[in-house]
Amino acid sequence: IGIDYKMNYMKKPFLFLLFVLAAVSCKEVEAPQAYGPVPTEAQMEWQEMEMYAFIHFSINTFTDIEWGYGDRDPKLFSPTELDCRQWAKVCKDAGFKGIIITAKHHDGFCLWPSRYTEYSIKQSPWRGGKGDLVKELSEACKEYGLKLGIYLSPWDRNHRDYGTPEYITYFRNQLRELLTNYGEIFEVWFDGANGGTGYYGGTNENRCVDRKTYYDWENTYKIVRELQPNAMLFSDGGPDCRWCGNEDGWVGETNWSLLRRNEVWPGYPNYTELRYGHEDGTHWVPAEVNVSIRPGWFYHESEDHKVKSLQQMVDIYYSSVGRNGTFLLNLPIDKRGLVHETDVKRIQEMTAALKADFTINLAEGASVIATNVR
C-alpha cells in the first residue's frame, strides 16, 4: 500500500507539469490575427457559388442589336414559347447556383410591369400585356433551388429625364420595385456603361453624365442594404464584388480580392486594374468574370454557329474560378423565349468535362507535414 501511495503522490506534479506544457503549447499556436480586409459571410457564400448564369433578353432580341436606342415599339417583344422553367432547368443541370436577369438594359425596356413607365412588357402582346417575366423567373428559380439576381442598367436611353436629378428618383423607385416584389435577391448588378446618345423621350440627343457623382451611389447602395441586406452589390468597383476588367472570360493569374474601393466607381476608366485587384487594397472586393457563350450578349441567329468551343468553356472555368473569381456565364435567350439548343448542348458538355476533371482526387494518399498544428 505504501508503494502505491507514493507512486500516486508523484503522479500529481507530473500531471500538473503536462497540463502547463500543453497550455503553453496551445498558446504558441493560437490563430493569428487577420491581416488586412477579410470577407463577410455573404461574400464567402457568394464565392462558394462558383458558377451562375447571366440572362440577356429584351427588345434587342427581336431587333437583332446589342444596345437598343430606346425608341423601339414595345409590341416587338413577342416570344412565342417563353419558358423560364426551361432556363432554370438548364442552369440547374449544369451545376449553376443562380441566375441574374437583365430586368432593364440600356434601352430602358422593362421586363416587369413597372408602375413608373409605360415602356415595358405591359405594352407588349406577350401574355396579353399582363405578364411579368421577372416574377416567372423568380418562381422558376425557387422551383429549381436557384438564387435570383437582378441587373438594372443605370443608363436609360428611353427616359426623358435621364441626366437630371429627376431620373435618379425614377431609377431608385424601379430599384425598390425589383427588390421588394420578387423574394430574396442574391446579387444586384450595376453596369458601368453610362451616358451617350439616346431617344430620351423623343429629343434624340447625346447626354453625358459624371459617372462618379451623378447616381449618388452611396445613397443608392443604402436602398439595397435596407431592402436586401444579404445581396451582393456588383459594379466596376464593388462595393461587394467587382468587374474583372474584360468580357473575354478571364481574370489575372495574380488576382487579389482586395481593392482600394474609394478610388473606383461604376464606369471607372482605368478598368484594366480590375483584372488583378490591388495588393494594398483597403476593402475585400473579389472579382466576378462575366462572359457570353456567344460573341454577343443578346441572341442573334447569325451566331448560332459561333458558340464557344468546349475547350474555351473549360479554359474559362479555370481562368475564373481557378483564379480566385466567380464565373458568370451569359446565356442569350432566343426569339422563342428559350435557351437555344446549341447553347444547351455546349453547357452540358462543359459540365461533363469538369465532372471528369474532378472525379480523380489527386491529393488522395498524399502525405502532409506541418511544423505546427492547433
Regions picked out by a protein language model, each given a short descriptive name:
Residues 6-13, 91:
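Positively charged n-region of N-terminal signal peptides that target proteins for export
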Residues 13-22:
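Sec-dependent N-terminal signal peptides
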Residues 29-374:
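Mature catalytic domains of secreted/periplasmic carbohydrate-active enzymes
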